[in-house]
Amino acid sequence: MNQSLLASFGSSEERVIAALDTFKQGNGVLVLDDENRENEGDLIFPAETITTEQMAKLIRYGSGIVCLCITDELCQKLELPPMVAANTSVNKTAFTVTIEAAEGVSTGVSAADRVTTVKVAVADNAKPSDLHHPGHVFPLRAAENGVLARPGHTEAAVDLARLCGYKPAGVICEITNDDGTMARTPELVAFAQKFGYAVVTIEDLIAYRTKYNK
């Protein structure tokens, strides 16, 4: 990661602290992975507090593939099997079958409908029958032990939520440029500065968790 591009957001640890502070308030955090991996930035919100306005931001400025990052425990509770039997994706992204709230939504596509689906999935009393398949929200199963086990945005979302005292679930979407191409670090920094988002890298989160044994 080109650290010079992130200098305005502070040191590695300062970036994590700022990200945790803003996430605790229910605000979004922009998480960047390694330039040799996906080289993308995901805007992430806590699943249990996400608003329709925040979801609309993800849809407006993201790829449109809004994902709900959750633990294996919740996947099992909701009986969400893997999307495919043999995962051949480069980064082994653990998609499950897609979901839609069984009640309270229309077509499931709008920002409000997707928020409803997310809230239903992470509710304390959630059960398999609360969800229909397929749907317009894409659950992702996080690796146990988070970014220390897999340096992905899925794990970063769950780690951020857990570290902030939320249920271990986050809503993410990759940020894109206006022309539809993927936003890279320079564009992501400009995006964060324009909208006032905290920026943190997965490398930052790994270092923080390792240092403080969290």
Curated annotation (Swiss-Prot):
The record lists the catalysed reaction(s) as:
D-ribulose 5-phosphate = (2S)-2-hydroxy-3-oxobutyl phosphate + formate + H(+)
Which residues carry the site feature described as Essential for catalytic activity?
H136, E174
**Which cofactors is this protein said to need?**
Mg(2+); Mn(2+)
Q: Which major enzyme category is it? A: lyase
Which domain of life does this protein belong to? Bacteria
UniProt keyword annotation of Cell cycle present: no
Its Gene Ontology cellular component terms are:
cytosol
Tell me the residue numbers annotated for binding Mg(2+) 2.
E38, H153
Q: Which residues bind Mg(2+) 1?
A: E38
**Keyword tags:** Lyase, Magnesium, Manganese, Metal-binding, Riboflavin biosynthesis
Q: What is its EC number?
A: 4.1.99.12
| Residues where D-ribulose 5-phosphate binds | R37, E38, D42, R150, P151, G152, H153, T154, E174
Per UniProt, the cofactor note for this protein states: Binds 2 divalent metal cations per subunit. Magnesium or manganese.
Q: Give the UniProt record's GO annotations in the biological process aspect.
A: riboflavin biosynthetic process
Cite the Gene3D superfamilies for this sequence.
DHBP synthase
GO molecular function per UniProt: 3,4-dihydroxy-2-butanone-4-phosphate synthase activity; magnesium ion binding; manganese ion binding
- Briefly, what is this protein's role? Catalyzes the conversion of D-ribulose 5-phosphate to formate and 3,4-dihydroxy-2-butanone 4-phosphate.
UniProt similarity note: Belongs to the DHBP synthase family.
Query: Which PANTHER family would you find in this protein's record?
Result: 3,4-DIHYDROXY-2-BUTANONE 4-PHOSPHATE SYNTHASE, GTP CYCLOHYDROLASE II-RELATED
| Record protein name field | 3,4-dihydroxy-2-butanone 4-phosphate synthase
